[in-house]
Curated annotation (Swiss-Prot):
Monomer. Binds 30S ribosomal subunits, but not 50S ribosomal subunits or 70S ribosomes. One of its GO terms (cellular component) is cytosol. The keyword Coiled coil does not apply. It is found in: Cytoplasm. InterPro entries: KH_dom-like_a/b, RbfA, RbfA_dom_sf, Ribosome-bd_factorA_CS. This is Ribosome-binding factor A. It comes from the Bacteria. Keywords: Cytoplasm, Ribosome biogenesis.
Length: 133
Protein backbone atom coordinates (compact mmCIF):
# COMPACT_ATOMS: atom_id res chain seq x y z
CA UNK A 1 0.00 0.00 0.00
CA UNK A 2 1.40 3.40 -0.97
CA UNK A 3 1.97 6.03 1.66
CA UNK A 4 -0.63 8.75 1.74
CA UNK A 5 1.91 11.41 2.65
CA UNK A 6 5.62 11.33 1.93
CA UNK A 7 8.28 12.38 4.39
CA UNK A 8 8.49 16.00 3.10
CA UNK A 9 4.76 16.50 3.68
CA UNK A 10 4.89 15.00 7.16
CA UNK A 11 7.92 17.11 8.12
CA UNK A 12 6.26 20.23 6.67
CA UNK A 13 3.11 19.61 8.69
CA UNK A 14 5.05 19.17 11.93
CA UNK A 15 7.26 22.15 11.09
CA UNK A 16 4.18 24.34 10.60
CA UNK A 17 3.03 23.53 14.13
CA UNK A 18 6.47 24.08 15.67
CA UNK A 19 7.10 27.39 13.87
CA UNK A 20 3.69 28.65 15.01
CA UNK A 21 4.59 27.81 18.61
CA UNK A 22 8.01 29.47 18.27
CA UNK A 23 6.49 32.64 16.80
CA UNK A 24 3.91 32.78 19.55
CA UNK A 25 6.21 32.12 22.51
CA UNK A 26 9.81 32.96 21.59
CA UNK A 27 9.95 35.80 19.05
CA UNK A 28 9.66 39.20 20.72
CA UNK A 29 10.36 41.50 17.75
CA UNK A 30 8.28 44.72 17.90
CA UNK A 31 7.90 44.63 14.11
CA UNK A 32 5.82 41.49 14.67
CA UNK A 33 3.42 43.28 17.00
CA UNK A 34 0.55 41.99 14.92
CA UNK A 35 -0.53 38.40 15.37
CA UNK A 36 1.35 36.12 12.98
CA UNK A 37 -0.19 32.90 11.69
CA UNK A 38 1.69 30.19 9.82
CA UNK A 39 -0.68 29.22 7.02
CA UNK A 40 1.52 26.62 5.35
CA UNK A 41 4.97 25.14 4.85
CA UNK A 42 6.33 23.63 1.64
CA UNK A 43 9.42 21.43 1.89
CA UNK A 44 11.88 20.54 -0.83
CA UNK A 45 12.24 16.82 -1.53
CA UNK A 46 15.66 16.72 0.14
CA UNK A 47 14.34 18.61 3.22
CA UNK A 48 17.02 21.28 2.80
CA UNK A 49 14.70 24.20 2.07
CA UNK A 50 11.34 25.25 3.45
CA UNK A 51 8.98 27.95 2.21
CA UNK A 52 6.99 29.24 5.17
CA UNK A 53 3.76 31.08 4.32
CA UNK A 54 2.48 33.49 6.96
CA UNK A 55 -0.47 35.83 7.40
CA UNK A 56 -0.82 38.75 9.77
CA UNK A 57 -3.87 39.81 11.75
CA UNK A 58 -3.58 43.46 10.72
CA UNK A 59 -2.52 43.07 7.11
CA UNK A 60 -4.14 46.20 5.70
CA UNK A 61 -0.87 48.15 5.95
CA UNK A 62 1.48 46.91 3.23
CA UNK A 63 4.52 48.49 4.90
CA UNK A 64 3.78 46.60 8.13
CA UNK A 65 3.51 43.35 6.18
CA UNK A 66 6.86 43.97 4.48
CA UNK A 67 8.45 44.84 7.83
CA UNK A 68 6.98 41.68 9.36
CA UNK A 69 8.35 39.47 6.58
CA UNK A 70 11.75 41.18 6.89
CA UNK A 71 11.74 40.63 10.67
CA UNK A 72 10.90 36.95 10.21
CA UNK A 73 13.63 36.55 7.60
CA UNK A 74 16.16 38.19 9.94
CA UNK A 75 15.07 35.88 12.77
CA UNK A 76 15.19 32.76 10.60
CA UNK A 77 18.52 31.65 12.09
CA UNK A 78 17.13 31.83 15.62
CA UNK A 79 13.95 30.07 14.51
CA UNK A 80 16.02 27.33 12.84
CA UNK A 81 17.97 26.80 16.07
CA UNK A 82 14.79 26.39 18.12
CA UNK A 83 13.24 24.26 15.39
CA UNK A 84 16.21 21.91 15.38
CA UNK A 85 15.91 21.39 19.12
CA UNK A 86 12.14 20.92 19.03
CA UNK A 87 12.02 18.53 16.07
CA UNK A 88 15.39 16.79 16.53
CA UNK A 89 16.27 17.09 12.87
CA UNK A 90 19.80 16.28 11.78
CA UNK A 91 19.65 18.95 9.09
CA UNK A 92 17.32 21.87 9.77
CA UNK A 93 16.04 23.34 6.49
CA UNK A 94 16.80 26.86 5.38
CA UNK A 95 13.66 28.92 6.02
CA UNK A 96 12.29 31.48 3.59
CA UNK A 97 9.21 33.46 4.66
CA UNK A 98 6.48 34.58 2.28
CA UNK A 99 3.30 36.57 2.86
CA UNK A 100 0.24 34.44 2.08
CA UNK A 101 -2.52 36.63 0.71
CA UNK A 102 -4.85 33.74 -0.17
CA UNK A 103 -6.92 34.30 2.98
CA UNK A 104 -7.37 38.00 2.15
CA UNK A 105 -8.21 37.19 -1.47
CA UNK A 106 -10.71 34.55 -0.35
CA UNK A 107 -12.48 37.04 1.91
CA UNK A 108 -12.51 39.62 -0.90
CA UNK A 109 -14.05 37.10 -3.31
CA UNK A 110 -16.62 36.07 -0.70
CA UNK A 111 -17.61 39.72 -0.20
CA UNK A 112 -17.97 40.21 -3.96
CA UNK A 113 -20.25 37.17 -4.25
CA UNK A 114 -22.31 38.33 -1.27
CA UNK A 115 -22.73 41.80 -2.80
CA UNK A 116 -23.78 40.36 -6.17
CA UNK A 117 -26.33 38.03 -4.54
CA UNK A 118 -27.71 40.92 -2.47
CA UNK A 119 -27.97 43.14 -5.55
CA UNK A 120 -29.69 40.31 -7.47
CA UNK A 121 -32.21 39.84 -4.63
CA UNK A 122 -32.97 43.57 -4.66
CA UNK A 123 -33.57 43.44 -8.41
CA UNK A 124 -35.98 40.51 -7.99
CA UNK A 125 -37.94 42.33 -5.29
CA UNK A 126 -38.07 45.60 -7.25
CA UNK A 127 -38.10 44.68 -10.97
CA UNK A 128 -39.21 48.20 -11.95
CA UNK A 129 -35.94 49.71 -10.70
CA UNK A 130 -33.86 47.58 -13.06
CA UNK A 131 -35.57 49.05 -16.15
CA UNK A 132 -34.35 52.52 -15.22
CA UNK A 133 -30.66 51.46 -15.37
Amino acid sequence: MAKEFGRPQRVAQEMQKEIAIILQREIKDPRLGMMTTVSGVEMSRDLAYAKVYVTFLNDKDEDAVKAGIKALQEASGFIRTLLGKAMRLRIVPELTFFYDNSLVEGMRMSNLVTNVVKHDEERRVNPDDSKED
